[in-house]
C-alpha cells in the first residue's frame, strides 16, 4: 500500500487555504516528498504526518515556490531526532542551491546526500522507491517524476519443496538472492512467479505538454499534473510562461491511459478551480481539481 498526499495546490505564492504545490508519499516506513515551497511544513503538520521518516526530497526545479521552504523543513526534521542521511534529488546545481539556503540552517544532526540530474531521463532506486526523473519543458531546467513500487511474483511453495530447497532458504530466494545447496545453485526464477503489477504515481508541474510526460505517466495509478490555467482564453499565456491549461493536462492523462488525474499548481487568479474542470473531464473523465491535503491509499490489485 502506498499513501499519497497532495500537501498543497498553489502555484507562484501561498494563499489563505492553499499552500504551495508539494507531494508526500509513505511506503513501508519511508516517506518521500516532491518540492518544498514556503509553508510546506505547515501543510505536513495539518495532515498529521511525521517529519522523521522523510528519506527523500525531490525537486522539480529551483524557482522559489518549489524550494524556499527547505531550510525550515530541514531544521524541523533535525528536531525530530533524525540521525540517518537524507537524500535530495534535483537538477544540476542542487548542491549550490541548497548550500545557499542553508546559511539560515547551518547545523543539522544528519548528513545530506545529493543526487544531481543531468540527463533527459534518469532512474534511481532509493528506500524501496523506483524513481524515474524526466526533463520537461519549462523556462528553466525542470523535471517530472514517476514513483513506482514494484511487486515481485508469488513464491511457489510446491516447486521449492519439489526441488528440495529447505524452508530456511526460502526467504533469500524471495528477496532475489540465489542459494547453493550441496554444490547446486538455485536461483529465484526457479521458484518465483512472474512479477505482479505494482503501483505508480507520476508528478509533473511547470511545463508545456510534451510527449515525455505522457510516456513516463503511462498507465499510472495516479497522475498529478499542473493546471495553471482553467479559464478560457489562457492558452497564449500558458505558452508564453511554459505552463499548462486544464485541457492540456487532460489530454496528457488520456494519452497516458492513467487511472486518475489530480490537477494542481493553480494560478493565484484561479479562485475556484473546480468551476473550470468540466471541459477537462470531456477529454479525460477521471479528472479531479484537487484541493490541499487530498489523500489516497493506493493498493495492490489483490489488496482490495
UniProtKB/Swiss-Prot annotation:
Binds 2 Zn(2+) ions. Zn(2+) 2 binds at residues 65-66, 206, 265. Keywords: Endonuclease, Hydrolase, Metal-binding, Nuclease, tRNA processing, Zinc. Gene3D superfamilies: Ribonuclease Z/Hydroxyacylglutathione hydrolase-like. One of its GO terms (molecular function) is zinc ion binding. It catalyses: Endonucleolytic cleavage of RNA, removing extra 3' nucleotides from tRNA precursor, generating 3' termini of tRNAs. A 3'-hydroxy group is left at the tRNA terminus and a 5'-phosphoryl group is left at the trailer molecule. Its cofactor is Zn(2+). Belongs to the RNase Z family. Zinc phosphodiesterase, which displays some tRNA 3'-processing endonuclease activity. Probably involved in tRNA maturation, by removing a 3'-trailer from precursor tRNA. This is Ribonuclease Z. It comes from Lachnospira eligens (strain ATCC 27750 / DSM 3376 / VPI C15-48 / C15-B4) (Eubacterium eligens).
